[in-house]
C-alpha cells in the first residue's frame, strides 16, 4: 500500500455552491492525473455543467444525486445559483437530507476516501463504513485559522465582536485583523442557523475537527505559516494541492471589447468586476462608479444590476453617464475576465476578492485594488494587502463598512503610481509572486507531495 504506484478510489461530495463544485472538480482532475479513480457526487441536472471540464473521463465518473424537496426551496433548485442568498440554508437542509442515500452510495462504490466540505455528518458516516474522510476547502486556510481555531473556543462562552476583531493568541500573523463591521458579520455566523438546528460556525468547525485530514488549494510559499498553525491547532495532517490557477483560455475576446480597449494606451484602463453572485446596493453601486470616474482613467465595470434597480441603465445617474461617455463602460452581462486581465491596455483590477478572481489577477500584470464584500473575501483581501502586500484595499468606515468615491479613487491611484512608495512595493511583490506562480513545475511538485501525504493517510 505504501508504493508510489498505489492508486485509490475516491468519492467527492461538495456543497452545492457553484464555486465549490468547480473547485472540487479541479482537484478531481489533478488526482485523476495521478491515476486515481474519482466518483463525483453531484445533483443530477447539474452534471451537464461540469462534463466539459472532465479531462479524464475514463477515471472520473459522475454519480447523480436527487436533491430532496424542502418547504420554501424552489422546485428543481440544485445549486446556489438557483436560489436567492437568504434561502441557501434551505439548500443546505436539503443536502443534509441526502445522508442515507450517501451512505448507500459510498458502501456500493467501495471507495477508500471521501472528500467533502459542508456536510459535517460525513466524517462519522465514513468511520461507520470503514473509510477515511478529508475536509477539502475551496477557501483560504488563513480563514479557518483565524475564525475557527480551537483556541478561540471556550465552553459556555459566546464569541464577541471584540474577540473576532483580533487574531487568536498564537496566530502566526497578529497584524491580520478584522474591522468592527466585519467582526460583526463573522460573529453573527456563530449564532446563525444554517441547515437544520446547527449554526454555520458549528457546522464548519465540526466538519474540520472530525475529519481524518484537511486539504487546501494553496502553497506553502503563500500560506505556509497558516497551514502549520491549522495543523497544530486541529492535530490533523494538512495536504496542499498547490494554488488553484486559471487554465489558459483558448477563446478570443469579443471584437467590440477588443476594439474599445485598443483605443487606450498600455496599462491605462481600470477593469472592475465583482463576480457572478455579488449584487451591490444601489448606493454602493453608484459610489463605486463615481470613484472610478474620479480617477480620470478609462474603465470597464462588469457588474450585476444592483438591488433596487431593474437594469444597469436605470441604476446609473444621468450626470454620471455624461461624464463617462467615451471612456467608461458599465456592463451587466458576463465577460471573458481572463482575457480582459491579459489585455495590454488593462493596468488595474478592482476586485471583490473572490479567490478565483484574485488568482487570475496574480498571474497577470495588472495591479490589484481590493474591495471585499463578505466572508472569506475579507480574509482574502487581508492576505493580499497585509500578508503578501501585492494590492491595496479600499478604505471603509470602521463601524459602518461604508466606502466613498474618494477612497476608491485613492486606492486605484496608489497602485497605478509607479513613483509612489506603495506603488513600487505592490508592483515589486506582485512581479515576484507572478514569476513563482507561473513556474511550470509548481503544480506537479505540489501534487506529488499531496499524493504522498494521501498515501500516508490511507495507509
Swiss-Prot record:
Signal peptide: none annotated. The keyword Thylakoid does not apply. It comes from the Eukaryota. Its EC number is 2.4.1.297. It catalyses: an anthocyanidin 3-O-beta-D-glucoside + UDP-alpha-D-glucose = an anthocyanidin 3-O-sophoroside + UDP + 2 H(+). InterPro entries: UDP-glycosyltransf_plant (IPR050481), UDP_glucos_trans (IPR002213). It holds the Pfam family UDPGT. Mainly expressed in the petals and tubes of flower buds at around 24 hours before flower opening. An anthocyanidin binds at residues 20, 375. One of its GO terms (molecular function) is anthocyanidin 3-O-glucoside 2''-O-glucosyltransferase activity. Belongs to the UDP-glycosyltransferase family. Glycosyltransferase that mediates the glucosylation of anthocyanidin 3-O-glucosides to yield anthocyanidin 3-O-sophorosides. 3-O-sophoroside derivatives are required for the bright blue or red color of flowers. This is Anthocyanidin 3-O-glucoside 2''-O-glucosyltransferase. The lineage of its organism: Eukaryota, Viridiplantae, Streptophyta, Embryophyta, Tracheophyta.
Amino acid at each position: 500500500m505504501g508504493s508510489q504506484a498505489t492508486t485509490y478510489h475516491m468519492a467527492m461530495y461538495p456543497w452545492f455552491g457553484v464555486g465549490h463544485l468547480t473547485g472540487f472538480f479541479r482537484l478531481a482532475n489533478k488526482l485523476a492525473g495521478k491515476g486515481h479513480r474519482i466518483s463525483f457526487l453531484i445533483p443530477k441536472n447539474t452534471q451537464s455543467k461540469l462534463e466539459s471540464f472532465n479531462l479524464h473521463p475514463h477515471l472520473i465518473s459522475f454519480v447523480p444525486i436527487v436533491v430532496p424537496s424542502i418547504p420554501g426551496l424552489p422546485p428543481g433548485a440544485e445549486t446556489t445559483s438557483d436560489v436567492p442568498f437568504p434561502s441557501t440554508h434551505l439548500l443546505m437542509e436539503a443536502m443534509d437530507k441526502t445522508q442515507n442515500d450517501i451512505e448507500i452510495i459510498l458502501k456500493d462504490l467501495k471507495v477508500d476516501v471521501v472528500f467533502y466540505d459542508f456536510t459535517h455528518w460525513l466524517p462519522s458516516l465514513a468511520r461507520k463504513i470503514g473509510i477515511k474522510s478529508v475536509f477539502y476547502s475551496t477557501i483560504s486556510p488563513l480563514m479557518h485559522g483565524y475564525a475557527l481555531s480551537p483556541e478561540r473556543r471556550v465552553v459556555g462562552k459566546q464569541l464577541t465582536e471584540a474577540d473576532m476583531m483580533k487574531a487568536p493568541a498564537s496566530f502566526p500573523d497578529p497584524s491580520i485583523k478584522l474591522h468592527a463591521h466585519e467582526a460583526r458579520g463573522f460573529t453573527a455566523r456563530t449564532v446563525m442557523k444554517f441547515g437544520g438546528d446547527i449554526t454555520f460556525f458549528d457546522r464548519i468547525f465540526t466538519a474540520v475537527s472530525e475529519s481524518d485530514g484537511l486539504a487546501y488549494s494553496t502553497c506553502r510559499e503563500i500560506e505556509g505559516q497558516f497551514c502549520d498553525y491549522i495543523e497544530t491547532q486541529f492535530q490533523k495532517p494538512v495536504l496542499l494541492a498547490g494554488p488553484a490557477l486559471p487554465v489558459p483560455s483558448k477563446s478570443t475576446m469579443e471584437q467590440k471589447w477588443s476594439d474599445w480597449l485598443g483605443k487606450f494606451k498600455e496599462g491605462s484602463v481600470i477593469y472592475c468586476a465583482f463576480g457572478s453572485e455579488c449584487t451591490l446596493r444601489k448606493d454602493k453601486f453608484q459610489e463605486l462608479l463615481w470613484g472610478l470616474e474620479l480617477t480620470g482613467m478609462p474603465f470597464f465595470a462588469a457588474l450585476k444590476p444592483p438591488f433596487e434597480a431593474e437594469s444597469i441603465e436605470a441604476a446609473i445617474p444621468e450626470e454620471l453617464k455624461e461624464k463617462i461617455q467615451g471612456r467608461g463602460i458599465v456592463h451587466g452581462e458576463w465577460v471573458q475576465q481572463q482575457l480582459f486581465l491579459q489585455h495590454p491596455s488593462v493596468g488595474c483590477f478592482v476586485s471583490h476578492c473572490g479567490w478565483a478572481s484574485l488568482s487570475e489577477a496574480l498571474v497577470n500584470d495588472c495591479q490589484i485594488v481590493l474591495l471585499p464584500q463578505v466572508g472569506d473575501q475579507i480574509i482574502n483581501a487581508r492576505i493580499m494587502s497585509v500578508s503578501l502586500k501585492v494590492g491595496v484595499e479600499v478604505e471603509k468606515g470602521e463601524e459602518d463598512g461604508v466606502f466613498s468615491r474618494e477612497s476608491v479613487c485613492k486606492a486605484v491611484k496608489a497602485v497605478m503610481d509607479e513613483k509612489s512608495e506603495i506603488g513600487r512595493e505592490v508592483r515589486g511583490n506582485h512581479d515576484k509572486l507572478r514569476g513563482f506562480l507561473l513556474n511550470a513545475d509548481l503544480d506537479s511538485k505540489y501534487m506529488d507531495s499531496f499524493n504522498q501525504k494521501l498515501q500516508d493517510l490511507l495507509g
